[in-house]
């Protein structure tokens, strides 16, 4: 995890989309590798949930699949395929580096929920990264 002013996709050789700098704010970004171990496609941008906590302050995370020159929460990951996922939130610069930072990423444990929208009632595992 790191603080950045802008978020770029992996392919910036031609036309691409990115998340631009906003005055007085920074993105807290985690780039993670997601492997779909299921037997059908998955929509990790829709069916997973992320949250950040910085020194007790809570922020909702956004989950975007890095698809070359673009990002999107609607991109799917085929069975047995791997994708890079950008999990991020926009925070005021005043909280940047102000204490322990934690990312919690909740992923359903049952494949039947991997093609819909996330619900707290789904059985899920929480993966936590702390810095």
Task: Write out the residue ranges for each language-model feature.
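Conserved functional micro-motifs across diverse proteins
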Residues: 1-131
